[in-house]
């Protein structure tokens, strides 16, 4: 069957669910699509369809970020269901880097947990501009005072990570209960109404993002597929600019640079002639083998961005109370650095100055020189996260690039 063309009639936003493992992110995503499928053309996605990777089903947790589409009366959303499990924060960073806004899911029975904090920190670091909160599983909490305490704790946590706790929309409900009643076609039930309130808050509380469509095209590659007889497809979010059929583009990163031609563009299995900043797309490339491309490379307008392996940065090292290191580190320290969809090991050098420190302590704000194992596409002002041993230990911004 021939694929349909993607018609852009509504504002497109990238949204996502973030939060601690088992707090109900995937169930909420399933409930949203099920509800919207009853009132418009959205395709319902079950929990098992969203949690679709075989390893995920076996463990009952989301590992890769799942991309789902749905429509409200006002907007078209690409929804990214992000992993909450600590082992898979790396994939969450990729998902969060693509979001215009996020739904932070917090279980009312637990309140904020370690990954709740880490997801908020990473959301801030990769530039997620707006957050709304779904306080889930309230059917399991009988004490209203306890609910109020959890809400207060969530608002305080939002303030810590520079999201305005006082003005953030917090919607209380139960994703599982809503899903049960939607499946019974009882859309006037109170649990379904709570879910409807959340969907309305999405439309109202997440502002329409300003897209950089006039800047040179840039897409950070998230995944790569081979299509027999057609070639290689790369997927990811367009960070800025536009791309159209037959455009010439550079693939660069990890010490490689190749030039190729765009021979197809798709979004949610529908064909596009042109795609622009904010779109989550698959791009078919001429004459490129799957093994030549890897996640973390970028597609870009030729010569609009260059690769570097060394840069200076302003960095904040998390304190132990923020989930960071407990001990200081010294020159030569080698953590992982995360940019868009890339993660690369790098070596830290303390910048020479009159009071050059011997060591850097958790909680310090410092300027560092970083040498990466590979050259990757970098720019001034680009933000990154620093991780070691399965946890985020710092966050930074590039202030200078070194040839």
Curated annotation (Swiss-Prot):
It comes from the Eukaryota. Residues 136-139 are annotated as: G4. The keyword Transmembrane helix does not apply. Its main location: plastid. Keywords: Apicoplast, Elongation factor, GTP-binding, Hydrolase, Magnesium, Metal-binding, Nucleotide-binding, Plastid, Protein biosynthesis. InterPro entries: EF-Tu_GTP-bd, EF-Tu_GTPase, EFTu-like_2, EFTU_2, G_TR_CS, P-loop_NTPase, Small_GTP-bd, T_Tr_GTP-bd_dom. The keyword Metal-binding applies. Residues 81-84 are annotated as: G3. GO terms for cellular component: apicoplast; mitochondrion. Residues 174-176 are annotated as: G5. Residues 60-64 are annotated as: G2. Its EC number is 3.6.5.3. It is found in: Plastid, Apicoplast. Residues 19-26 are annotated as: G1. It catalyses: GTP + H2O = GDP + phosphate + H(+). Transmembrane segments: none annotated. One of its GO terms (molecular function) is GTP binding. GTP binds at residues 19-26, 81-85, 136-139. Mg(2+) binds at residue 26. GTP hydrolase that promotes the GTP-dependent binding of aminoacyl-tRNA to the A-site of ribosomes during protein biosynthesis. Belongs to the TRAFAC class translation factor GTPase superfamily. Classic translation factor GTPase family. EF-Tu/EF-1A subfamily. HAMAP family: EF_Tu_B. This is Elongation factor Tu, apicoplast. It comes from Eimeria tenella.
């Amino acid at each position: 069957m021939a694929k349909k063309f993607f018609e852009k009639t509504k504002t497109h936003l990238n949204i996502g669910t973030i939060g601690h493992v088992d707090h109900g992110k995937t169930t909420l995503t399933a409930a949203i699509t099920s509800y919207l499928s009853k009132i418009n053309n959205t395709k319902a996605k079950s929990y098992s369809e969203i949690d679709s990777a075989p390893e995920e089903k076996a463990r009952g947790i989301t590992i890769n970020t799942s991309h789902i589409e749905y429509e409200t009366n006002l907007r078209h959303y690409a929804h990214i269901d992000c992993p909450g499990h600590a082992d898979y924060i790396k994939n969450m960073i990729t998902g969060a880097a693509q979001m215009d806004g996020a739904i932070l899911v917090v279980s009312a029975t637990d309140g904020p947990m370690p990954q709740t904090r880490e997801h908020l920190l990473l959301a801030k670091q990769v530039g997620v501009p707006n957050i709304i909160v779904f306080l889930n599983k309230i059917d399991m909490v009988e004490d209203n005072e306890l609910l109020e305490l959890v809400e207060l704790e969530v608002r305080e946590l939002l303030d810590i990570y520079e999201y305005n706790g006082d003005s953030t929309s917090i919607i209380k409900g139960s994703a599982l209960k809503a899903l049960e009643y939607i499946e019974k076609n009882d859309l006037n039930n109170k649990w379904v109404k709570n879910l409807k309130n959340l969907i309305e808050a999405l439309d109202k509380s997440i502002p329409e993002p300003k897209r950089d469509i006039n800047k040179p095209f840039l897409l950070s590659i998230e995944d790569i597929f081979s299509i027999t007889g057609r070639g290689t497809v790369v997927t990811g979010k367009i960070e800025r600019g536009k791309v159209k059929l037959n455009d010439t583009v550079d693939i660069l990163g990890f010490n490689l640079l190749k030039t190729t031609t765009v021979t197809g563009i798709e979004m949610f299995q529908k064909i596009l002639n042109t795609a622009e900043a904010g779109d989550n797309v698959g791009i078919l490339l001429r004459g490129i083998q799957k093994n030549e491309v890897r996640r973390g490379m970028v597609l870009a307008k030729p010569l609009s961005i260059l690769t570097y392996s060394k840069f200076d940065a302003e960095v904040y090292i998390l304190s132990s109370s923020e989930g960071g290191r407990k001990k200081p580190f010294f020159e030569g320290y080698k953590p992982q650095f995360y940019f868009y969809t890339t993660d690369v090991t790098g070596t830290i050098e303390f910048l020479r100055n009159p009071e050059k420190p011997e060591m850097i302590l958790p909680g310090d704000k410092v300027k560092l020189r970083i040498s990466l194992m590979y050259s990757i596409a970098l720019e001034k002002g680009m933000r990154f996260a620093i991780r070691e041993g399965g946890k985020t230990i710092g966050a930074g911004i590039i202030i200078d690039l070194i040839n």
